[in-house]
Amino acid sequence: SEYEELSQALGGCYIDFMSGQYTINPLEPKAWSDGTEEMDLTAPDAFKKVTRLSQHIAFLKDFFRAYKDFNDAQIDTIEILLSKLYARFGITDSTDYSTKRPTDFPIMEDFYKLCEEEFYGYDKQRKYLYTEETLQEVCLGIHSMCVGSESKYFNGHTNITDSNFLVFGVKGLMDTNKRLKDAMLFNVLSFMSDKLLTVGNTV
């Protein structure tokens, strides 16, 4: 396309997400605020949380809900499992993200493995906050985006080149099913928000 040629001519990076060449890792915690503004009570939950991790988990709840029609119990289970996943990777509320590289964060495949692990290891004699059935439904719901046919759009570490000029090619995205499109646009939004707040000079 003309935008691809233009971005290459200017030394930029053209990102066609339908190609699967570039990945934005949904599980890499992004910045949702610069920490200086007063809390807006009407803002979405992702903007009202305090730490980058808690903000990002709030975003992920909306992200997963955009991808599949999860009910509240399933989303609450996903939140608990995400907290377990980040703890496993040493990502906490006090993590210094300036020392982290994209490869330091879990990817969707890791999240699916944890969900499967929790499901297959479910002990009916123990008390859990979530049911075995809910775990199974979560595993089924995220399978395609984590390890299945749609995983090429979500599963992997962020690999977008450092560039002052990025062009997001979303034309092909408009032809996909609504839930995949919404989840991918959510993911692009998280990346753009992060760059705007951490790098600046972003249009």
Predicted feature residues:
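P-loop NTPase motor domains
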Residues: 1-13, 17-203
